[in-house]
A protein has these predicted regions:
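N-terminal metal-binding scaffold of metallo-dependent hydrolase/deaminase domains
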Residues: 1-47, 212-214, 232
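Divalent metal-coordination and catalytic microenvironments
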Residues: 10, 28, 33, 58, ...
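C-terminal cap of metal-dependent C-N hydrolases
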Residues: 14-16, 180, 201-241
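Residues at the N-termini of beta-strands
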Residues: 37, 96-99, 226
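Short loop/helix-cap segments at secondary-structure boundaries that form the rim of catalytic
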Residues: 41-49, 109-112, 125, 136-137, ...
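Divalent metal-dependent hydrolysis catalytic cores, especially in the metallo-beta-lactamase
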Residues: 68-71, 84-127
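His/Asp/Glu-enriched, well-ordered alpha-helical/loop segment
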Residues: 135-206
Length: 241
């Protein structure tokens, strides 16, 4: 089996597995929607003439983000609700949120660039979603949401809250990254995503920074260079494999 998509020369690959393994100068090989190899060293055995290759030199790769508390526009007419939801989901997608958990079954959808699942259970760990809710006592383990749909809250990115948590409240980068990737996947039984491991779905973000710490220290500058959903790059342009 050869790779349909291969990302090479990754400065830092944050797998978000149970040990939070970080691989340096690594590569990811994908066969259609699944990850078939992550490693360092030579990747040539995974190539054939049809393999699409992405060079991520000087960049890091993380799992695509998961927002576990999306609230749709339920207070408007159905037609307006669908239109407003589409606009909101597009804006979140531009900020790397490729999976969402929603409390409205009408908002469920699975598309090439983004999935929305109906919330069938309440999380056992707290969800941080508003800057005004942040206290000096931050729970050791938490999930993160951008808080879209709360009263007077039109935030389409988890960058503002993660910036404050990292810079002001000194929450470590591992805790932050897991709160928007592997932890929500585990909490809502999305076993096919949330980490970069062999056999998982290739939902990936390529960031224009060498470390995740740099990403959490930055506001106001788009740092997502590439987005890959189900093993296919769709941002900044489609790359058919």
């Amino acid at each position: 089996m050869k790779a349909t998509l291969l990302i090479k020369n990754i400065e830092n690959l944050y797998t978000c597995d149970k040990d939070f393994t970080i691989l340096h100068h690594a590569f990811i090989a994908c066969h259609h929607e699944k990850i078939i190899e992550i490693n360092t060293g030579s990747y040539k055995e995974w190539l054939d003439p049809a393999t699409r290759v992405i060079d991520a030199q000087g960049e890091c790769v993380v799992p695509a983000f998961i927002d576990c508390q999306f609230k749709s526009f339920t207070h408007v007419r159905l037609g307006d609700q669908l239109r407003q939801d589409i606009n909101a989901l597009y804006a979140m997608r531009q900020n790397g949120i490729l999976t969402l958990i929603c409390d409205n079954p009408n908002s469920q959808r699975m598309k090439l660039e983004q999935d929305v699942f109906y919330k069938k259970n309440q999380p056992k760990i707290p969800v941080l979603q508003r800057l005004s809710e942040l206290k000096n006592e931050i729970p050791e383990t938490f999930l993160m949401s951008c808080g879209f749909g709360l009263p007077n809250s039109y935030v389409y990115s988890m960058a503002p809250i993660s910036y404050v948590l990292f810079q002001t409240l000194r929450v470590c980068s591992r805790t932050l990254l897991e709160s928007m990737t592997s932890l929500p996947a585990k909490e809502f039984n999305l076993s096919d995503r949330g980490s970069i491991e062999i056999g998982k779905t290739a939902d990936l973000l390529v960031l224009q920074v060498t470390t995740i710490e740099h990403y959490f220290q930055t506001l106001g500058r788009p740092l997502i260079h590439r987005m890959i959903k189900n093993g296919i790059q769709f941002y900044p342009e489609w790359m058919v494999c």
